[in-house]
Amino acid sequence: MKRLLTAGLLAILTTIFCMAQVNEREILSDELCDKMCAAAHEKSKELGIDISFAIADRHGLPRVYRRYGDALVLSITLVPGKAYTAAVTQCKTKDVAGAAAEGAPLMGIQTNDPRITLVAGGYPLFVDGKIVGAIGVGGGTEAQDCEIAEYVVNVFEELTK
């Protein structure tokens, strides 16, 4: 009887987990990712800069990466790292940097996971208060990267209402 209850509970939990995965994939659909990429590119052209742009799922795993124009080669690794960091911490990378400063609660977090970056430009994406993914932007100044990221987050929020 105990085994039967355990097996039933496991089946229910597996179903719930799979449903959550499907919902996440539905939210970060190819179509939505394309629209977010277009928004990032549009804003970067408005600012007159070439950027790299990444989207990660809620686990920080890559969903999309785009390098526009002559964006810095460094951005090839840095920008996906921004998206990863924002996803796994559920915070803007700029905020993670503050929390990782000497004496702060997360001091040294970046030494535990080489994918963590403390460079501004990573923003989490939430739907109904739940993390569904994150974006990373790089190629401009800190202010430009954040301006583009905030623009894309606003587009995302409008499209997922």
Residue ranges of each PLM-predicted region?
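Flexible, solvent-exposed loop/hinge segments and secondary-structure transition points
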Residues: 21-161
